[in-house]
């Protein structure tokens, strides 16, 4: 579906249009050789075992054809960085290899801005802070990540409090590095896991969260062609706003 109408084979998507894949809405903004995609919660970025259809890459291929970077191969065309299936929000897609290399280098040099918002369990002691702790595969469960010294990569997350609620905190996180599950692992490491996180979170939360509350809110980078700094922002999705409202009601009693 494009803007609520059935899509036709070969139909192109234009800036500001909304695309639906398996009922999930994707908003796409174009800036010449890069695309900013607002991914919905519950959508996998690229095909993998158990998720071959209904991915973001499937949608990009359908609407962009072969005009995507090929650096990451046929399974991840245009994908410069990823966000988890149950994380909503922004990611950048490269339309050619030149753009891909430029964006990847900015990520490597830590000049690529990525800001998230999350609801975490408990009340943070300080209004802001930094978690500087290496992340690697959990030796007891290879599907999970953990803070570990051996066979790990440096990882740095800056956080600040937006609003405090009874038993929970609404925070902003800024990534200095971009490791797998970084925010989820780091916040769990300091005792304040992302609410609704079924992997790293707490059991039996007071609020019935349906999946993790983590949204990629802002992305900023130097445009590969114009050399201008540009930013994209994404409004908090309805699911996130719903939980903030619940927390407001709980905290007011």
Predicted regions and their residues:
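Active-site-adjacent capping/gating segments
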Residues: 208-216
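A structural signal for well-ordered alpha-helical scaffolds and beta->alpha junctions
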Residues: 53, 128, 152-155, 212
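RNA pseudouridine synthases
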Residues: 1-130, 134, 239-246
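Short, surface-exposed loop/helix-turn segments at secondary-structure junctions
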Residues: 146, 196-208
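Post-Walker A helix-loop "phosphate-sensing" segment adjacent to the P-loop in P-loop NTPases
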Residues: 191-195
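The conserved catalytic core of RNA pseudouridine synthases
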Residues: 73-105, 113, 117, 136-190, ...
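Glycine-rich beta-alpha junction loops
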Residues: 122-124, 177, 204
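Active-site flanking residues adjacent to catalytic metal/cofactor-binding acidic residues
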Residues: 37, 185, 196
């Amino acid at each position: 579906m494009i803007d609520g109408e059935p899509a036709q084979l070969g139909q192109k998507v234009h800036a500001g249009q909304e695309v639906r894949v398996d009922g999930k809405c994707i908003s796409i903004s174009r800036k010449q050789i890069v695309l900013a995609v607002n991914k919905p919660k519950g959508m996998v970025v690229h095909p993998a075992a158990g998720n071959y259809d209904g991915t973001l890459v499937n949608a990009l291929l359908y609407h962009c054809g072969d005009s995507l970077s090929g650096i990451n191969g046929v399974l991840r065309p245009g994908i410069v960085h990823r966000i988890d299936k149950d994380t909503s929000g922004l990611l950048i897609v490269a339309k050619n290899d030149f753009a891909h290399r430029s964006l990847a280098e900015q990520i490597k040099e830590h000049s690529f801005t990525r800001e998230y918002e999350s609801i975490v369990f408990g009340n943070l002691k300080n209004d802001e802070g930094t978690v500087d702790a290496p992340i690697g595969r959990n030796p007891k469960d290879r599907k999970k990540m953990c803070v570990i010294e051996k066979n790990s990569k440096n990882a740095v997350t800056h956080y600040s409090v937006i609003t405090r609620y009874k038993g929970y905190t609404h925070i902003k996180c800024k990534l200095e590095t971009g490791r797998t599950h970084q925010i989820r692992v780091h916040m769990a490491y300091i005792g304040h896991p992302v609410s609704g996180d079924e992997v790293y979170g707490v059991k039996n939360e007071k609020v019935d969260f349906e999946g993790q509350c983590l949204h990629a809110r802002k992305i900023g980078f130097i445009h590969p062609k114009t050399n201008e700094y540009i930013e994209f922002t994404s409004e908090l999705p309805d699911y996130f706003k719903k939980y903030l409202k619940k927390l407001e009601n709980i905290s007011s009693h």
